[in-house]
Amino acid sequence: EEKESEYNIIYLFQPAEENGSGAAICKPLFEKYHVDKIFGLHNMPNLRKNVIYYRPETVMCASVGYRIALTGVQSHASEPEKGRNPVYALSAFAKAIEPLAKQTGFQPFTFENYHFSSLAMITIIHMNVGSLNFGISPANGEICLTLRAAKENELSILERYVRSYFEGLKEEFEVSIEEFDRFDENYADPSLVEKTIMKLKSAGLEVEQLSEPIRASEDFGYYKRFAPSMFVFVGMGTCPSLHHDSYVFDDEIIPTAVHMFQVVIR
């Protein structure tokens, strides 16, 4: 529009968005430019096209990936009692967390002696024991998990549970735990949301509040450590979901996204 803003504006094009590592690279920008607030936007299939969707407080969940390896003792398949095969320990853990794999809502619940105020879940994304060798009772096995929670402090509860479980196996197995792809809770500052939504409505943009957070994660949540933040979605209408083989970005939502940022800048 060739108009000057009374604010200094930084356009942040962040790398490595999919694994949670890129946001941390951008930390020096907040210190250098003294950022007062930050806004983010993402397209979203299967929400009404060209509508801005928002939420105060939790917008998207916190999550982290764990890779847990157990090493026991190999033996001949005819003498499994002489070895320590990790398959039973890993299978017992997989069965124990099955209720957490079935959590889909954001209501309070209790798992064993752990209490959660909202969604908390664990997804098994990989599990492997031994190899295709019918003469061996294997010594090695691993399980890989995505831990996810609406609240960061409750993601920490899930982490304590998992670590405690495998700490209890250290007399029988060598245990290794690696961490991957940590994402903070994507949290929208309620005051910033209220002010911004009023401005968007006044500018003629259609807005709608999400009834609950999105279960996926987004490393935009990291930025709330440095400034009040707000993250919204632009609906794409009915179409294949993000990351689906048939997904195609719809250019027709770009003007809505640009208009939203123009309003924010003003």
Task: State each model region's role.
Residues 208-265:
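Zn-dependent metallopeptidase/amidohydrolase metal-coordination segment
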